[in-house]
Amino acid sequence: MDLIFDSLKGLFNKNGYRLFMVGGTSRDYLFGIKISDYDFATDATPNEVEKFLEVDSTFEKYGTVKYHYNDRKIDIATLREEGEYKDFRHPSFIKFIKDINLDYKRRDFTINALYIDENYNILDPSGLGVKDLKNRILRIIGNPEERIKEDPLRILRAERFCLEYNLKIDEKTKMAIDNNMDLLELINEGKIGEEKRKLNEIKRKFQYEKCKL
């Protein structure tokens, strides 16, 4: 059980909406480690969330609002579909939806596409997330080549997750990463800097590489 999730899910349910743990939150929860970053998904739009919760709506146009719970910053994302990525980072359009079976397709890796509902049921729309979590496999969702070209920062995230959680990279995912390493040179430093910082923190923490890309 998680205190923050329990506190917010009741508020969302009271207002007629669903709330799910997702991404790094559900991944860390299922690995049994302390949750560091809180990511929730909901069928409420940002405008609907703002009616009953005081949030930072800076990134509202991307379908995400931020909520401060004591000293914690929580990302609350509306379930959505996304168009093609034009700038290696942002989709050409987003469409708000109600179905996690569509929302999961925009996420990066199968272990990050596990949804935990209000009753702590594990929902695995990709059909591979639970299996990959148990076997510690990092697998990209969809066509690996297309998904890496969509957002090359997934290359750095893959290496970070592999190191941090002692994961093995799926063969097709590894091949797509190897084929597209040069795309990182096209990303401006502002966008790539935060991912590099997180990766370097993990490398310093472990002082050795469990996964070399």
Residue ranges and their predicted role:
Residues M1-L213:
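Catalytic cores of the polymerase beta-like nucleotidyltransferase superfamily
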